[in-house]
Amino acid sequence: MDPCKFRPSSSFDTKTTTTNPGQPVWNDNEALTVGPRGPILLEDYHLLEKIAHFARDIPEPFVHAGRASAKGFFECTHDVTGLTCADFLPSPGAGTPVIVRFSTVIHERGSPETIRDPRGFAVKFYTREGNWDLLGNNFPVFFIRDGIKFPDVIHAFKPNPKSHVQEYWRVFDFLPHHPESLHTFFFLFDDVGIPTDYRHMDGFGVNTYTFVTRAGKSHYIKFHWRPTCGVSCLMDDEATLVGGKNHSHATQDLYDSIDAGNFPEWKLFVQVIDPEQQDRFDFDPLDDTKTWPEDLVPLQPVGRLVLDRNVDNFFNENEQLAFGPGLVVPGIYYSDDKMLQCRVFAYADTQRYRLGPNYLMLPVNAPKCGFKKNHYDGAMNFMHRDEEVDYYPSRHAPLRHAEPASFPVPTRPVVGKREKTRIKKENDFVQPGERYRSWAPDRQDRFVALRRRLAHPKVSHELRVIWIDFLSKCDKSCGMKVANRLNVKPSM
């Protein structure tokens, strides 16, 4: 038996403590010193190894640092073969193993899970044709529509670089330059801004993807996760009480529920738009700051997601769990959504920086199907290979391409000038206004009350006027209520 062919695991455990290379450790309580009170000796290899390893823990992610994961399966319940040739979405009944990561977006690891903050909802499908990562949030929209502004919007929400205190005046200073962000604000500062826990939370793909059939027919797709136990959220006073007792209440709720056999479940729905019909809407379907109205684009059921197993090791299956929207499978592809296009690179590059270039070899990230590639070298390459050819093509190792028909991609021609420009159909105020008017009066009042952050001394009178102008364009009564609270006369 060649031990090099097997990854280290708990099956190699010994009855006694060892160093990383396997030498016995006869004392893990005291460092090696000259006498009982003398200086520590550098020859204490175990001490040096222990401290050096501890000091080299991987950094926490810049976003989605607070996270909880669980494993389970996805089962197709409805036939969608007319929309996609994805191997794991055939006729009803097919099951696919998954791992799901829930997270808070902005705040650091260990922050209360009751903070008003978007929540991440990421699913990794281990399909027979590779891994598919569906990354989303608990809101269907995002703050900006162009990925070039992603670092800026995250910096605006992150703590002040001088004081390291999160201050909302920075947010209210930045976002007026991007009125498309209003729609997400009407979610974040609404009653749904603080989910009760992860089990009672919606999930949305946010970006527009593409389903492709074997014949090459494409459809634009939006993904929706709906919890079978319903959506539940916390009011501010409830969040303060819950978070004060337990900073990790949502993580504990998820773990304890699965441990008790109360398995969380979500239904997956899609919205479908034929690209040939996209011009009939008063918004751009590729704009991730917009929702697709369900009365015009109804939800279609696809399947169900069940989480029935907790992770075995938090670090291995949570901290090292890496997602990226670039991971798609035959039958599912990207769209020209500007935010999605940037995320395809950004997420993978983040993982290479944080986990190393071979992060997809880590067991939690590796595909469960067969695979063959030629880029193995680099840090943390622990896969045993014994071939002589690591290039393509070669007559010594007759590897061949997959058939083009096995991975159809959209073939729509694209013509245009090279330019940096905004999309034509911005229409930033209609959908936030419709959402506001759909609320009961008390819910509207709670939303308006959260605008008290506009009273911060660093939010200038000019900024307050701009915000009131934007809110008035969404809904005149909303703008008037905020203006009255701030004692500011609206400009319209």
UniProtKB/Swiss-Prot annotation:
<keyword id="KW-0479">Metal-binding</keyword>
<comment type="similarity">
    <text>Belongs to the catalase family.</text>
</comment>
<keyword id="KW-0408">Iron</keyword>
<dbReference type="GO" id="GO:0020037">
    <property type="term" value="F:heme binding"/>
</dbReference>
<dbReference type="InterPro" id="IPR002226">
    <property type="entry name" value="Catalase_haem_BS"/>
</dbReference>
<dbReference type="Pfam" id="PF06628">
    <property type="entry name" value="Catalase-rel"/>
</dbReference>
<feature type="active site">
    <location>
        <position position="137"/>
    </location>
</feature>
<feature type="active site">
    <location>
        <position position="64"/>
    </location>
</feature>
<dbReference type="GO" id="GO:0004096">
    <property type="term" value="F:catalase activity"/>
</dbReference>
<keyword id="KW-0349">Heme</keyword>
<comment type="function">
    <text>Catalyzes the degradation of hydrogen peroxide (H(2)O(2)) generated by peroxisomal oxidases to water and oxygen, thereby protecting cells from the toxic effects of hydrogen peroxide.</text>
</comment>
<dbReference type="GO" id="GO:0005886">
    <property type="term" value="C:plasma membrane"/>
</dbReference>
<dbReference type="Pfam" id="PF00199">
    <property type="entry name" value="Catalase"/>
</dbReference>
<feature type="compositionally biased region" description="Polar residues">
    <location>
        <begin position="8"/>
        <end position="22"/>
    </location>
</feature>
<keyword id="KW-0576">Peroxisome</keyword>
<feature type="binding site" description="axial binding residue">
    <location>
        <position position="347"/>
    </location>
    <ligand>
        <name>heme</name>
    </ligand>
</feature>
<keyword id="KW-0963">Cytoplasm</keyword>
<dbReference type="GO" id="GO:0046872">
    <property type="term" value="F:metal ion binding"/>
</dbReference>
<dbReference type="InterPro" id="IPR011614">
    <property type="entry name" value="Catalase_core"/>
</dbReference>
<dbReference type="InterPro" id="IPR018028">
    <property type="entry name" value="Catalase"/>
</dbReference>
<feature type="region of interest" description="Disordered">
    <location>
        <begin position="1"/>
        <end position="30"/>
    </location>
</feature>
<keyword id="KW-0560">Oxidoreductase</keyword>
<dbReference type="GO" id="GO:0042744">
    <property type="term" value="P:hydrogen peroxide catabolic process"/>
</dbReference>
<dbReference type="GO" id="GO:0005829">
    <property type="term" value="C:cytosol"/>
</dbReference>
<dbReference type="InterPro" id="IPR020835">
    <property type="entry name" value="Catalase_sf"/>
</dbReference>
<dbReference type="GO" id="GO:0005782">
    <property type="term" value="C:peroxisomal matrix"/>
</dbReference>
<dbReference type="GO" id="GO:0042542">
    <property type="term" value="P:response to hydrogen peroxide"/>
</dbReference>
<keyword id="KW-0575">Peroxidase</keyword>
<dbReference type="InterPro" id="IPR010582">
    <property type="entry name" value="Catalase_immune_responsive"/>
</dbReference>
<keyword id="KW-0376">Hydrogen peroxide</keyword>
<dbReference type="InterPro" id="IPR024711">
    <property type="entry name" value="Catalase_clade1/3"/>
</dbReference>
<dbReference type="GO" id="GO:0009725">
    <property type="term" value="P:response to hormone"/>
</dbReference>
<comment type="subunit">
    <text>Homotetramer.</text>
</comment>
<protein>
    <recommendedName>
        <fullName>Catalase</fullName>
        <ecNumber>1.11.1.6</ecNumber>
    </recommendedName>
</protein>
